[in-house]
Amino acid sequence: LKRACAAAVVAAALSTLALAQKPAASAANPGYAQRFASVCAACHGANGRSELPLTPALSGQHSFYAITQLFLFREGRRGHEGMTAIAKTMNDADLRGFSEFIATLPVVPAPAPATPPDAARMANGQALAQQHKCFACHGADLSGGQQVPRLAQQREDYLQLTLQEFKSGKRPGYTMAMGEAVSRVTPEELDTLAYFIARFAPQAQKK
């Protein structure tokens, strides 16, 4: 009940922020491109594709999801020392400006893996993704939508961490959907899901 109430408070606050966002990501304030380069690029990459461990790729991410995460960091509801320190310097206009700019970053493909994906593990991962409704919420190509993050091309180590934190309750969400989705998934299955999602290629799945 406590977690549900907290989610409701977050949802209400984010709705207010979202209503003030511009209708199209292409209308992003160009000043935030420079601020992204100076504030965010060192960790997340100039093009939104990070090479640092446990650091998410931002390229291709949706503005509403981005503003949600910045809000959670700013309000201390999502824990990360570095991100919290940065987000606490942002006002509501900054949250909107950065999230709108992030949404303009084109998708940067993940580097080719050193070895071909393990076919059996990919099949297991796909079965788990179907069983636990990953495609139903995040889309057939895992590209997500405004309130649902893009997963395709995300770093495997970051996916592992995120899934583990949702399962443990450490990671908050806009809703309780993710916590419920992974509540009965074993740690080993979470690793298999992360392995699959990080290597998922929609066209390859259709062949």
Q: Where on the chain are the PLM-derived regions?
A:
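C-terminal capping alpha-helices of c-type cytochrome domains
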Residues: 88-111, 157, 183-207
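Extracytoplasmic/secreted proteins, especially bacterial periplasmic and envelope-associated proteins
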Residues: 31, 35, 65, 82-85, ...
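Bacterial N-terminal signal peptides
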Residues: 7-16
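Inter-heme linker and motif-flanking segments adjacent to c-type heme-binding CXXCH motifs
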Residues: 49-50, 79, 104-116, 120, ...
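C-type cytochrome heme c attachment motif
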Residues: 36-45, 64, 68-71, 96-100, ...
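Sequence/structural segment immediately N-terminal to covalent heme-attachment motifs in c-type
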Residues: 22-47, 110, 117-140, 155
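Positively charged n-region of N-terminal signal peptides that target proteins for export
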Residues: 2-4
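Gly/Gly-Pro-rich "capping" loops immediately C-terminal to redox-active cysteine motifs
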Residues: 48-78, 84-90, 126, 142-168, ...
